[in-house]
């Protein structure tokens, strides 16, 4: 049996893995022959996020990766961010391998953080790439360097968070592969079948690029064998 590469999907703040599966249903169908999408639930309880109500009123409870509580002390905020990174890394090590990570809104911040962790000190053998949908900024790692792993950026031209999506794009070095798709829409997944197929094609292309990069760089890097469990599909 041929196993499809897995893509980890991280939902937006105040949403859920179930909501993201609905939002990504067209993209999941377009990618089904090549990839298996795995949807992870955020670690913290949350109020419904932007655009969640009223359509997803019956899809609670809602969760997030970090809270938007402005009363948190800096050390409390940093603890939340560290916990989110550790939570995602633990899941990836237990249920990997994963070929890439797809993040929507706050989930894009989480995705960027995991890519930066992999650059800083590789925690997995996987050749990761990231896909940012309507991404917000910044990552959960303060004063982080640019992301040098391959990335895809999906930007809504009327998204109120467009500037943050552009900041995230600027945070990815031009020396690496970074592909950009813009669509006429706001802070949501593109609904056009043509745009969805284009995104699927670019994700597949970026996956192949990341695999070639893995082969070319494999002699440079020593990665500890720390994966504890692989989940068979």
Curated annotation (Swiss-Prot):
One of its GO terms (biological process) is secondary metabolite biosynthetic process. Disruption phenotype: Does not alter fusarin C production. The keyword Metal-binding does not apply. GO terms for molecular function: hydrolase activity. The active site is at residues 105, 159, 187. Induction: Expressed under high amounts of nitrogen via regulation by GLN1. Moreover, components of the fungal-specific velvet complex VEL1, VEL2 and LAE1 act also as positive regulators of expression. Finally, expression is induced under acidic conditions in a PACC-independent manner. Its EC number is 3.1.2.-. It holds the Pfam family FSH1. GO terms for cellular component: cytoplasm; nucleus. Signal peptide: none annotated. Keywords: Hydrolase. Esterase; part of the gene cluster that mediates the biosynthesis of the mycotoxin fusarin C. Within the cluster, FUS1, FUS2, FUS8 and FUS9 are sufficient for fusarin production. The other FUS cluster members are not essential for fusarin C biosynthesis. Belongs to the LovG family. PANTHER family: ESTERASE DBAE-RELATED (PTHR48070:SF3), ESTERASE OVCA2 (PTHR48070). This is Esterase FUS5. The lineage of its organism: Eukaryota, Fungi, Dikarya, Ascomycota, Pezizomycotina.
């Amino acid at each position: 049996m041929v196993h499809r590469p897995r893509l980890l999907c991280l939902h937006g703040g105040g949403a859920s893995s179930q909501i993201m599966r609905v939002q990504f249903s067209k993209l999941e169908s377009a990618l089904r022959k090549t990839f298996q999408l795995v949807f992870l639930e955020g670690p913290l309880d949350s109020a419904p996020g932007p655009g969640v109500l009223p359509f997803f009123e019956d899809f609670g409870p809602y969760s997030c990766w970090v809270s938007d509580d402005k009363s948190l002390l800096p050390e409390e905020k940093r603890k939340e961010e560290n916990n989110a990174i550790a939570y995602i890394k633990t899941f990836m090590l237990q249920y990997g391998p994963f070929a890439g990570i797809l993040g929507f809104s706050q989930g894009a911040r989480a995705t960027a953080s995991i890519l930066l962790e992999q650059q800083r000190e590789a925690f997995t053998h996987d050749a990761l790439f990231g896909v940012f949908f309507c991404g917000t900024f910044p990552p959960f790692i303060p004063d982080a360097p640019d992301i040098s792993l391959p990335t895809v950026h999906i930007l809504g031209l009327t998204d109120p968070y467009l500037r943050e999506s552009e900041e995230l794009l600027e945070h990815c070095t031009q020396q690496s592969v970074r592909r950009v798709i813009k669509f006429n829409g706001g802070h949501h997944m593109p609904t056009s079948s043509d745009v969805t197929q284009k995104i699927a094609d670019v994700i597949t292309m970026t996956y192949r690029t990341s695999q070639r990069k893995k082969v070319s760089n494999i002699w440079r890097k020593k990665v500890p064998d720390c994966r504890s469990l692989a989940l068979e599909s």
